[in-house]
């Protein structure tokens, strides 16, 4: 972005509203991609400007007319320039992301939380878990810990094991566990899927948002996604390397009334093509999103022969 253009913004713009308008114009002109917690330029501008000013996004409209100091304008412009030039997702610039009504710390060690599973958590995974005990939950590929922690908030008597192979991701998850006050019920641990936990029926719910982007899609993703850790996105030729292992192993860790919930995004097409006999229930979301399936323990056991070649060695 031209220095003269930036100096002009700092010199001539006066109010918060001016900066919001300028940010929206810059985002639209640069054709940035929205897919990390917002879907439009205005919400991105609000997030960056209010973060720079240490203001809550829910503050009244009257503040829009407030004048800015020179240092405040410089700080805002710097964030907007980074968003445009580097194509950094807003949550990596603010280190904040909201998920299931909670605010999480995030940085480039983890994916930005955005799973539609948040809606299922708010609905307590109904109807599958209605009236059933939920004492222990397993979150595979936990990343920032957002799903695990949100589950702990919704099921306030349950313990949640939050597993990930990435030590970097687990460091972020631990920050969120401590910040959100669930140290006594959410337990991050390093594990290659199920490798770190003893075999046996112990979880009433296994939930996972694993890597699921296939080889074809990974190269076509907008620049913003390339700031996220590749280990959290790519999963082989068809995007299902980890999902197949989860399907092959999950049943032995579920209680008799337990369920498996997995997000596979666009790779749902590959999954249905490869396993047409499996009765996946694909969740319909009111707030947008797709590619999340549910299977019961009994359904997993019934179709274990289809997944046998993907089972981890014991």
From Swiss-Prot:
UniProt-listed GO biological process terms: methylation
GO CC annotation: cytosol
Enzyme Commission number: 2.1.1.298
Keywords, in A-Z order: Methyltransferase, S-adenosyl-L-methionine, Transferase
Protein known as: Ribosomal protein uL3 glutamine methyltransferase
UniProt catalytic activity: L-glutaminyl-[ribosomal protein uL3] + S-adenosyl-L-methionine = N(5)-methyl-L-glutaminyl-[ribosomal protein uL3] + S-adenosyl-L-homocysteine + H(+)
Entry-linked Pfam families: MTS (PF05175)
Keyword Metal-binding attached: no
Lineage: Bacteria, Pseudomonadati, Pseudomonadota, Gammaproteobacteria, Alteromonadales
């Amino acid at each position: 972005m031209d220095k003269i253009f930036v100096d002009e913004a700092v010199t001539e713009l006066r109010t918060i509203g001016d900066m919001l308008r300028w940010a929206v114009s810059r985002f639209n002109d640069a054709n940035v991609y929205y897919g990390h917690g917002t879907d439009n330029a205005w919400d991105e501008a609000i997030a960056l400007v209010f973060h720079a000013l240490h203001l809550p996004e829910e503050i009244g409209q009257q503040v829009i007319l407030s004048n800015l100091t020179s240092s405040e304008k410089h700080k805002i412009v710097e964030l907007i320039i980074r968003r445009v030039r580097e194509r950094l997702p807003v949550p990596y610039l603010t280190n904040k992301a909201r998920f299931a009504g909670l605010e999480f710390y995030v940085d480039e060690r983890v994916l930005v939380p955005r799973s539609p599973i948040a809606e299922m958590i708010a609905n307590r995974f109904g109807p599958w878990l209605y009236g059933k005990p939920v004492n222990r939950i397993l979150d595979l590929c936990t990343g920032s810990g957002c799903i695990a922690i949100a589950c702990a908030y919704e099921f306030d008597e349950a313990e949640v094991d939050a597993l990930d192979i990435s030590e970097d991701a687990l460091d972020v998850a631990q920050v969120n566990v401590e910040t959100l006050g669930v140290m006594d019920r959410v337990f991050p641990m390093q594990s290659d899927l199920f490798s770190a936990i003893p075999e046996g029926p112990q979880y009433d719910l296994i939930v996972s948002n694993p890597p699921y982007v296939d080889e074809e899609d990974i190269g076509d993703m907008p620049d913003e996604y390339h700031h996220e850790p590749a280990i959290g996105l790519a999963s082989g030729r068809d995007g299902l390397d980890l999902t197949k292992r989860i399907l092959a192993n999950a049943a032995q860790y579920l209680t008799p009334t337990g369920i498996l919930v997995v997000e596979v995004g666009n790779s749902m097409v590959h999954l249905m093509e490869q396993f047409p006999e499996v009765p996946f229930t694909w969740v319909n979301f009111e707030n947008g999103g797709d590619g999340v399936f549910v299977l019961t323990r009994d359904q997993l056991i019934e179709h274990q022969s289809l997944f046998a070649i993907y089972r981890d060695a014991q």
